[in-house]
Amino acid sequence: KFQKNLKTLNFFLDEYCKDFNFVHILPFFPSSSDDGFAIIDYKKVDNNHGDWNDFKKISSKFNVMVDLVINHCSSSNELFKNFLNNDEPGSDFFIHRRNSSGLSKVVRPRTTNLLKEIKTKFKKGYVWCTFSHDQVDLNFKNPKVLIFFLNIIKFYLDSGALALRLDAVAYLWKEERTKCINLPETHSIVRLIRFLIQNYSPGSILITETNIPNEENLSYFGNNNEAHCIYNFSLAPLLIHAII
């Protein structure tokens, strides 16, 4: 009986997909919710899925895209545990707020409350949770958070990934009294990642996952200096509609 892991995927691709050259493997890291998009450990393959050797066997034969869940991580991630306990690394990796003042304009993709209350010996107040209370948003106003993810990007590229999908990247930067989506600082970070990728690993591909109106979506191409590709969520159903 086949198991749902990287070994099975490797067999399937070899057996049935030899004419394909590109594969997107959805998050295969330890996760606590949201179908893998609440990452507990960015550098570990979930034991149920295999290990990095299994991944490298696939990436040696196919161009592989992996998800970089960059806006948030799991509340079970060691970084968030360190944040709650004022330990390092992570003590200042998340958005710590006293109240919801200035947040009335924030765009909400989910129906859960934006802020999650925290109470520990070291920290009291609220943290920012765009998608769920198990997915805590990271604070990109802290340069250490950006450096952390640049190291993760290097690790993924070194492990054989060709393309990186920046998940929920439109929500990355937060400012009070704004919609907190598609802010200029977010585009600056995408440009920086593009610049570093094309210099460190020429030929690698950066893709933004932005489920937003078309004009705003297209802005993530920048001036040919942001994403190489962008997701067009409306295209797939429109193609099906055209066929039927």
Question: What annotation goes with each model-predicted range?
Answer:
Residues 241-244:
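Short, intrinsically disordered, charge-balanced linker/junction segments flanking boundaries
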